[in-house]
């Protein structure tokens, strides 16, 4: 029985008995030889200063388990071998060993004596010592101690009591979690368990964690309040009684310093967002909390976990029995649980704000949801539902923004394509969804960039597209934008799908039917889909080419927005066609279409023709002149059996001409045997044995039987003389047998807007990195030509330094114009430099004589001309200014007439002559102007006025000819006029009560009242500053100036 009961003495939680502690050391030395061989014995522990309790604790430890909190076996030890032993020996602890053993064993002896159990006698012999050694070896070799026997009933209540003490709460005086750093960087936060935990254990631990967390918060508050300092005092004042912005800033700082102990401020921010009242306060708190979540509160690589997802079954093992480590885990887990609930509440508030009546609030809530969805995985499902739901917003701005935000989300996280498309699909198939929301959702799906690794997603998208396609066809809603969006989506998803052929093949007949009734843009999408399907199977049918041949004459081609897409489709179709005569028919019709198109499309079509000629050299025979392609009239035989000839004009037949031809070919005697008209289509069954036409039929439906091989591409000759220089250059290049070498986009480079942009002489705004990134989905990247001459301003030195042969033909006009302008400005500068010379005294005196009158005191009649010199001087000043203005205007705009726009045929001499003569004006009224008969044919009033003014005294050309060298004296007869000549003016104003004779005389032809006339006179005085107030102000101002001048003169004299 002793051997069975002996292992109970070595239980970790049971104190050691004093009877076994007091043993003869000599006997122990004899019996511990086996333990010394293993390298671990009681004697070794006692020699190092330990006790028997230390020996038993070390003996029961498992080497594979953690020794201390955070320590593991195999960790790097910095201590060298024997270093610890030497340190303990230096302490001289051996003399205290026996005394410490006796003192520790006394309380254990008292406790064991009080129990009513069978006492084990003292170990005084070898048998008991051997049994003890065997039990120690068993404990040391096993991971856990052996189970207790039924006979030992004293240990069971002790274990139950220990289990009950696990959930007891003990207050501490120090913080378990130190402030600073991110809370999710602690190793405790990543511990979780996928197994469901018992609910009773979880509830008990949660209660304990709540108490621990509350005590931790209270302890943190007490220590914070006890701190003394300016920063802490200021922070407390701001949080409690500050403005909204200051309070938010202070709370952010506190949360960033220690998020675990400031969870109350996180809850305060959420309540501010929820608060109904000021929208400005709500939006401010919304942005603040969003930034806080992204930067500090939410981890990057995982979601937040609730409290029940923690490994409570391994909690004691993880903490190694250390209560502080266990409590730290509980506090951190409880904090994360509470934070997860607050974030979920915030997401619900975002959902409420996204349905607000104000557009600004909805937009801000949508943007916040998108940023959280892009940056953090927390609540991503709820946030994704919110953003996708905004595709159906009644306001188009919000729906468009939601589509754009989803595109940017997929650009940042491409792995979310399946999740996002599934959510959009659920939106599409809702029962109460609007058609506009469906359209926006389809537009988002067809903009999704796919890859060959995502064939399942492509198949799923094609299924959704054709489901809505059938719905649109059944509703006969083929003119809607939805059909075009669906066909666009199928075109983009088809190359990446694996089972798309079967689904498309079912709808081929429907696509051909829809092709002829929809608008041009939608028909281009349908043709592209048909070409992809047939080209992948190498079975491009004649039906497709006939439909494409017919679509080329659609008037919508001129105004559609998919001209580049259509030309690309034509190029691919012709390159894949093996029938050469059908390719000739397409090229012929394409050149015919260009006759009514704008220059950008013509340039693009000519470039396409050049590439087709490069791919199929057999088409070069069409460049040769055929007899039917001449512009002259031709006579050909109608039939081989008849001698009759008919008169036709090749390539310009109409239905009326055909009727006349058939009537002429029929003999007059046999009118009843008239031949039927030739049909515009040919049945397949009638191909064998039929006669081929030897002429071109432009109205044929089938390009195989239009006879395009019998004519030439004479349209190129007409295009070679086109008004647009680039069109003419492209056409001449093809006629000469060369290929067009062009690296740009003709549809964009030759537009009117691009031409007008060349007149804006400033550097364009730089594009901020959106063209060469993935932010612009499904858009072609822009080509940047660093040395492209088209990016140089046309008036720059670099542009003008180029040779004319290096300039594009559409910009030769700018090059020639600014070259001549530069030469003209240089000549003007040279002339101005030559004119700036020193003036001699004699020349200066002669110049003064032209302005001053030498005989002003000799003749009395000239004394009456008081303002003669003033008028002439002002006139001379005006002459000079007008001369300068006229010369400047001539330099800039004098030669831009209609006849002089084409500067290619104008020589430099002619340009200079026109410039010199263009700045002068004719002298209309000269000294002999009275003899001109055209000027004498006027009314009586005009002749009297001209006599009274004296036309001889006014020189209107003087302002353009500069100062006269000879002074012209005034005629005395112009000043003295008889009263008979203006007597009719006196008769009209007879009886009026105002001044009608003096200097301020006023005419009153409409017999206005005196009050009205006075008001007009006062108003005229006020306008010309002749009223009393204006005169007084002038006098005061004059006095002030005079005072200032006198003061200045006095200072200068001093």
UniProtKB/Swiss-Prot annotation:
Protein name in UniProt: CCAAT/enhancer-binding protein zeta
Role of this protein: Stimulates transcription from the HSP70 promoter.
Protein's cellular compartments: Nucleus
Region forming the signal peptide: none
Residue intervals passing through the bilayer: none
One Pfam match: CBF
Primary residence: nucleus
InterPro entries: ARM-type_fold, CCAAT-binding_factor, CEBPZ/Mak21-like
Residue ranges of the region described as Disordered: 1-42, 102-160, 873-902, 915-969, 1031-1054
Comp. bias (Basic and acidic residues): 1-20, 109-120
Acidic residues: bias regions: 21-34, 882-902, 915-933
Entry's Gene Ontology cellular component terms: CCAAT-binding factor complex; intracellular membrane-bounded organelle; nucleoplasm; nucleus
Molecular functions (GO terms): RNA binding; transcription coactivator activity
N6-acetyllysine carried by residues: 695
UniProt keyword annotations, A-Z: Acetylation, Activator, Nucleus, Phosphoprotein, Transcription, Transcription regulation
Gene Ontology biological process terms, A to Z: positive regulation of transcription by RNA polymerase II
